């Protein structure tokens, strides 16, 4: 099976309150940068053939050195990201389209992942890739622990309470049949329509495409706020302990 991966890693960590637009991908958890953990997971996933990363210009040489020093051979290209997350993914998509045209080989699936989600596991990546190839689309998610409410017309007053049993918190990597994801990004670019994730693009332009749910654990967090670094240390320790038992 051939899976191609795009990692969006251009976040500057505004909510992390980092100085000088520093990349949150370089924050250390367990003595290694966040992006190191992310690269390692995809390197170890058996279904993954190549990985394209979009990041900040200043991070490109640093990321390349991390990949080289650690033998992350599946990292195919590390390029400059765009203004928005969707633009960054689009930049990688252009390279993937060129590779498809040159090789004449269509991947079985394309996965899109947030670089700031360092705890996705290789076996989960493989599961999502296979389900994406089989069903055309697959997105990981977790059940919310908290009650979710709408905000009312008055932004200081709650509206209705949502039925938590029908809600899921969506994560990445999100996997898709390559042709549909490529076309969805092309159409969104023409329309200048931006979404917060790739599943929303596929939902908009291919409403007939069912998206398979892949329920993950609560370890696959996105490093977004300062508290997440401390939570990440605990998650990493738990993952290591679980692996040592096995």
From Swiss-Prot:
Residues under site feature: Positions MEP for the nucleophilic attack: 164, 222
Site feature: Transition state stabilizer: 15, 24
Job of this protein: Catalyzes the formation of 4-diphosphocytidyl-2-C-methyl-D-erythritol from CTP and 2-C-methyl-D-erythritol 4-phosphate (MEP).
A Pfam family recorded for this sequence: IspD
Tagged with keyword Transferase: yes
EC number: 2.7.7.60
Catalytic activity: 2-C-methyl-D-erythritol 4-phosphate + CTP + H(+) = 4-CDP-2-C-methyl-D-erythritol + diphosphate
GO molecular function, one term: 2-C-methyl-D-erythritol 4-phosphate cytidylyltransferase activity
Protein family: Belongs to the IspD/TarI cytidylyltransferase family. IspD subfamily.
Name used for this protein in its record: 2-C-methyl-D-erythritol 4-phosphate cytidylyltransferase
Classification lineage: Bacteria, Pseudomonadati, Chlorobiota, Chlorobiia, Chlorobiales
Keywords: Isoprene biosynthesis, Nucleotidyltransferase, Transferase
Gene3D superfamilies hit by this protein: Spore Coat Polysaccharide Biosynthesis Protein SpsA, Chain A
Pathway recorded for this protein: Isoprenoid biosynthesis; isopentenyl diphosphate biosynthesis via DXP pathway; isopentenyl diphosphate from 1-deoxy-D-xylulose 5-phosphate: step 2/6
Example GO biological process: isopentenyl diphosphate biosynthetic process, methylerythritol 4-phosphate pathway
InterPro entries: IspD, IspD/TarI, IspD/TarI_cytidylyltransf_bact, ISPD_synthase_CS, Nucleotide-diphossugar_trans
HAMAP family, A to Z: IspD
């Amino acid at each position: 099976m051939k899976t191609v991966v795009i990692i969006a890693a251009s976040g500057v960590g505004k909510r992390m309150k980092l100085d000088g637009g520093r990349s949150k991908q370089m924050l250390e958890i367990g003595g290694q940068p966040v992006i190191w953990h992310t690269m390692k997971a995809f390197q170890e996933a058996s279904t993954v053939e190549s990985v394209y990363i979009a990041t900040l210009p200043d991070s490109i040489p640093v990321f390349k050195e991390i990949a080289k020093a650690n033998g992350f051979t599946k990292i195919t290209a590390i390029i400059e990201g765009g203004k928005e997350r969707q633009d960054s993914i689009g930049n990688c998509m252009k390279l993937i389209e060129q590779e498809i045209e040159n090789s004449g080989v269509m991947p079985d699936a394309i996965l899109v992942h947030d670089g700031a989600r360092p705890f996705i596991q290789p076996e989960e990546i493989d599961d999502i890739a296979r389900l994406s190839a089989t069903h055309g689309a697959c997105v990981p998610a977790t059940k919310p622990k908290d009650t979710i409410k709408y905000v009312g017309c008055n932004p200081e007053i709650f509206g209705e309470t949502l039925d938590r049993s029908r809600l899921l918190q969506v994560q990445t990597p999100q996997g898709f049949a390559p042709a549909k994801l490529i076309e969805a990004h092309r159409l969104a670019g023409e329309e200048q329509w931006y979404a917060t994730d790739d599943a929303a693009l596929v939902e908009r332009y291919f409403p007939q495409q069912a998206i398979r749910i892949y329920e993950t654990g609560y370890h696959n967090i996105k490093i977004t706020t300062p508290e997440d670094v401390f939570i990440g240390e605990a998650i990493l320790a738990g993952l290591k302990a679980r692996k040592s038992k096995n």
